[in-house]
């Protein structure tokens, strides 16, 4: 189960059955699909399945208050276990624990071009992103941070 709120008043949630919901300000709206993790931010709404398949929700870039279009598969090589959507950047933790960012994420190409490994950052479990600063927790429980330079 997870709940995710963005600066743009977008609230998304996943229940224990991996069903997806978006809060409309009045009620919860069921969204098609099944996810294990979701992130909402200026770079749009992104999600992961248990198998590590990565999805992007079109028409949600710039934290647009909408349910968006249908989920689109994003190249998940490497397979991810955690995603975070920020201002013009999406970061992911691979199942290996390595940190990646999605290159070329912008309004014209909201899914970006591909995953780029962040050097000297490994053993990560979970991350979040604020502008170009990534903060996360590694597998030992230590907090780490990195700047993403695209």
Name these PLM-found stretches.
Residues 1-2, 6, 10, 16-41, ...:
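Trp- and S/T/G-rich repeat-edge/linker motifs of beta-rich repeat architectures
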Residues 10-14, 44-48, 89-93, 133-137:
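Short beta-strand elements that form the blades of beta-propeller/WD-repeat-like
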């Amino acid at each position: 189960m997870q709940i995710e709120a963005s600066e743009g008043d977008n609230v998304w949630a996943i229940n224990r059955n991996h069903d997806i919901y978006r809060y409309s300000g009045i009620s919860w709206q069921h969204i098609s699909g099944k996810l294990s993790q979701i992130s909402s931010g200026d770079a749009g709404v992104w999600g992961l399945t248990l198998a590590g398949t990565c999805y992007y929700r079109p028409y949600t870039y710039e934290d647009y208050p909408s349910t968006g279009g249908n989920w689109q598969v994003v190249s998940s090589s490497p397979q991810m276990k955690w995603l975070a959507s920020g201002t013009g950047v999406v970061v992911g933790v691979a199942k290996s624990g390595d940190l990646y960012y999605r290159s070329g994420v912008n309004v014209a190409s909201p899914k970006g071009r591909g995953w780029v490994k962040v050097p000297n950052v490994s053993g990560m479990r979970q991350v979040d992103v604020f502008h170009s600063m990534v903060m996360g927790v590694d597998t030992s429980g230590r907090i780490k941070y990195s700047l993403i330079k695209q």
